[in-house]
């Protein structure tokens, strides 16, 4: 018997609500990183839709690199200084939750799938605000990376 699982739109709206509750939406920048083989662009686009379901203006941008200075100058600073009021920028790319880069994000999401899953206490997973399993992309699951 097949198990019920929430649709992608429902999961991403719930993740957006979690981010809203934790860090707010006043020019908030979110980082989305993940293991090889995950579609970070799809996840970022779905998260934009999740924020929009809550009435929050959001947009996604691909990271030009995982270099902290370049990310700050090309994406983070222009977003934070060019507008006023609520708005969320979701930056997606490999390596953007690495040590030294992760401090750019007010909230972050690590994306993985069953094959190649990182250990529960892997540094990048510990640093992420949330973990998303996209083994079934139509029904992604929020994972709880706790030690309980």
Short names for language-model regions:
Residues 33-37, 63-65, 92-94, 112-113, ...:
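Structural motif
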Residues 23-25, 81-86, 102-103, 125-126:
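Flexible, charged surface loops at secondary-structure boundaries
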Residues 3-4, 54-100:
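Conserved nucleotide-sensing/catalytic segment adjacent to the nucleotide-binding pocket
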Residues 30-49:
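Glycine-rich phosphate-binding P-loop
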Residues 9-24:
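Pre-Walker A adenine-sensing motif
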Residues 27-31, 87-90:
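Residue-level preference for the first positions of well-ordered beta-strands
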Residues 1-9, 29, 95-96, 101-148:
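Conserved NTP phosphate-binding and transfer environment spanning the P-loop NTPase/kinase superfamily
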Residues 1, 19-21, 32:
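N-terminal membrane-targeting/anchoring modules of bacterial envelope and secretion proteins
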């Amino acid at each position: 018997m097949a198990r019920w699982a929430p649709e992608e739109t429902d999961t991403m709206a719930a993740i957006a609500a979690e981010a809203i509750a934790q860090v707010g939406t006043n020019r908030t920048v979110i980082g989305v990183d993940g293991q090889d083989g995950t579609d970070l662009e799809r996840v970022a686009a779905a998260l934009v839709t999740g924020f929009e379901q809550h009435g929050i203006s959001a947009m996604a941008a691909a990271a030009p690199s995982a270099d902290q200075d370049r990310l700050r100058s090309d994406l983070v600073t222009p977003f934070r200084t060019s507008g006023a009021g609520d708005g969320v920028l979701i930056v997606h790319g490999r390596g953007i939750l690495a040590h030294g880069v992760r401090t750019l994000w007010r909230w972050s999401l690590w994306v993985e799938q069953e094959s190649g899953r990182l250990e529960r206490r892997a540094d990048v997973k510990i640093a992420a605000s949330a973990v998303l399993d996209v083994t079934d992309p139509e029904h992604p699951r929020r994972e709880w990376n706790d030690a309980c």
